[in-house]
């Protein structure tokens, strides 16, 4: 029975998911496949990651960021080390992220250690950004109190007017979210949504199909 009309899901359902029954040996391969498919399906913001961090006493915060890239070890993103998420990552070293693609009815959960990148990698991230993005990232101290909005705007405008790449602020850093657990979720019209979980097992991965 098709019960999708009772759901709040507004995108496609029953997208192809052959890996559900024949999963790759590790999850990054599947993540890359899904991202490539999302591009073809014209998902509007495939890199919008809802990233949750926490303090050492368990107080959770979350925000949506755009991750930078994916390599064979995980998902790379950047932030200010002095921001709330930066401070919480320093406290615990762990984070959990969720990609939700309304257009295709898919979700990907990524949970694991957020490992700081080397300074050379931070530089590569910074100088890989378009020059106009440097101004506000240099002028702002992310998550600090905003005392004078116009002063910050003016400072960023002065930097932008220079028209050159700016030095990377030391507080601008990158992390790699290296998964210890990942889950791939695909909506189904019969509500038997397909959930495939990967769990780190030493140097290998264990896969499990989960009930919806």
Swiss-Prot record:
Pfam families: PNP_phzG_C, PNPOx_N. GO terms for biological process: phenazine biosynthetic process; pyridoxine biosynthetic process. The keyword Ribonucleoprotein does not apply. It comes from the Bacteria. FMN binds at residues 63-66, 78-79, 84-85, 107, 142-143, 195. The keyword ATP-binding does not apply. It catalyses: (1R,6R)-1,4,5,5a,6,9-hexahydrophenazine-1,6-dicarboxylate + O2 = (1R,10aS)-1,4,10,10a-tetrahydrophenazine-1,6-dicarboxylate + H2O2; (1R,10aS)-1,4,10,10a-tetrahydrophenazine-1,6-dicarboxylate + O2 = (5aS)-5,5a-dihydrophenazine-1,6-dicarboxylate + H2O2; (1R,10aS)-1,4,10,10a-tetrahydrophenazine-1-carboxylate + O2 = (10aS)-10,10a-dihydrophenazine-1-carboxylate + H2O2; (1R)-1,4,5,10-tetrahydrophenazine-1-carboxylate + O2 = (10aS)-10,10a-dihydrophenazine-1-carboxylate + H2O2. GO terms for molecular function: FMN binding; pyridoxamine phosphate oxidase activity. Binds 1 FMN per subunit. Involved in the biosynthesis of the antibiotic phenazine, a nitrogen-containing heterocyclic molecule having important roles in virulence, competition and biological control. Catalyzes several oxidations in the terminal steps of core phenazine biosynthesis. It oxidizes both hexahydrophenazine-1,6-dicarboxylic acid (HHPDC) and tetrahydrophenazine-1-carboxylic acid (THPCA) and thereby contributes to the generation of both phenazine-1,6-dicarboxylic acid (PDC) and phenazine-1-carboxylic acid (PCA). It synthesizes phenazines in their reduced form, which are the likely end products in vivo. This is Dihydrophenazinedicarboxylate synthase. It comes from Burkholderia lata (strain ATCC 17760 / DSM 23089 / LMG 22485 / NCIMB 9086 / R18194 / 383). The lineage of its organism: Bacteria, Pseudomonadati, Pseudomonadota, Betaproteobacteria, Burkholderiales.
């Amino acid at each position: 029975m098709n019960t999708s009309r009772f759901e709040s899901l507004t995108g496609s359902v029953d997208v192809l998911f052959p890996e559900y029954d024949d999963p790759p040996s590790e999850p990054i391969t599947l993540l890359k496949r899904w991202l490539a498919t999302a591009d073809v399906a014209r998902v509007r913001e495939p890199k919008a990651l809802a990233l949750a961090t926490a303090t050492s006493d368990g107080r959770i915060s979350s925000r949506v960021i755009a991750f930078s890239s994916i390599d064979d070890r995980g998902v790379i993103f950047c932030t200010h080390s002095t921001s709330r998420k930066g401070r919480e990552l320093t406290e615990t070293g762990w984070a959990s992220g969720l990609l939700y693609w309304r257009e295709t009815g898919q979700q990907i959960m990524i949970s694991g250690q957020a490992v700081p990148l080397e300074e050379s990698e931070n530089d590569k991230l910074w100088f890989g950004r378009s020059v106009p993005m440097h101004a506000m990232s240099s002028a702002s101290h992310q998550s600090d109190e905003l005392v004078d909005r116009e002063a910050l705007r003016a400072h960023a405008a002065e930097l932008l007017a220079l028209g050159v790449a700016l030095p990377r602020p030391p507080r601008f850093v990158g992390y790699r979210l290296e998964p210890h657990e990942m889950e791939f979720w695909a909506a189904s019209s019969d509500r038997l949504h397909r959930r495939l979980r990967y769990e780190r097992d030493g140097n290998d991965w264990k896969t499990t199909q989960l009930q919806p």
